[in-house]
Structures are given as C-alpha cells and as structure tokens.
C-alpha cells in the first residue's frame, strides 16, 4: 500500500490478512494463505507547534529509526531514547514500543487508521489506544480490523533529556559527556543496543522478545 486510494480494494479480498511493516518480527515457516498488506505509506509533516511543543505527523511506512534521526536533526526531543528500534512507524503504537525509560505513549498524540470493513479513516487518541506495557487495543480487541496509516507525535522543543536508565549514564560518562543533549543520548542508546544485539539486516535475530516481570508494589 503506497497510496490511500488502494485501501478500498482490501475488503474484497480474503478475510485472512497479514499487515506487514518492515518484517523485523516476522518468521514464516510456510506459505501464508491470505492477503499480505505491505504498508509503504511515506511522509513526515510538521502539522502545528506552540511555544513548547511540535506536532509531527508521520506516515506508517516510514522506518522508525529514520524518524528518530530526523527528529534529532530538527532538535525535537522525546524519541531519542528509542533509537535503533527496528520496524516501521505503523507498528510502534501497536505494542507501545519502549526502551531505556521511555515509551511511545509518552510522546503519542493521535493516530489515523483504516477500518477495513467499514472502509473509512478513524482517528484514535491516546485513551482510545488503551496503551499498556507493550500493549494496545490493536493487539487485542481490534486486532486485524484496522491498518494504521499515520501517527502524530507531540515532541518537545526543550533540551531536557531522560538519562534515568543507568546504562545510559554509564555510557555517557565513558564518552566524557557531562551535559548531554538529545544527540548524545541517542548515541549512547545506539552504543548500548549495538553491544547487545547484532544488526538484524546483517544477522537475522529475534531481538529482545521478553517483557520485564511486573510485581505488586508491596513486594518491591
């Protein structure tokens, strides 16, 4: 799917649908019996701003890490801790991606999605997405019913960074960085991730597929 006009054709196809982004979390063991929808919508647009924030609408087919680098180049803060996460923009709200002290929901404003059966565009705000720990409504009750078209992020004009995750501060210290900006935090995150996992484009791997355990507060 490279144009919105192509979406009207989907309802006529088989009910078995695989919505494919970058494919970084897909391993096929046999032929898929259904229609594969490859989301290749492109575009990054600054739609509005105020004194403290910018609102950036990003098409679902854009590569996540490329968007992070674009935000850093523009001095837009908020996603630098999510550097080098594989996949596309459209997949990011599905599981509320997160790493090193930041989750997608922290910078999420709204998204647009295509209702396959009703053949219309629907806008979801943060509450309607029902974000949880690596969870959203699109992984549960609305699974395979919508195709995410774009995500709008609310990013900060502030230079304040989040280095609460211990390893980030350790790497920054080893780099001799005393007052880090978003670029330095991104560099530290990239260094940490690269030391733990090979580039999936070079060596196929399952990445980090586990979730941290959640325990009652009284046991912490």
PLM features: residue spans?
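Phosphate/pyrophosphate- and phosphate-bearing ligand-binding catalytic cores of soluble enzymes
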Residues: 26, 121-220
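Anion-binding (especially nucleotide phosphate/pyrophosphate-binding) glycine-rich loop
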Residues: 1-111, 115-117
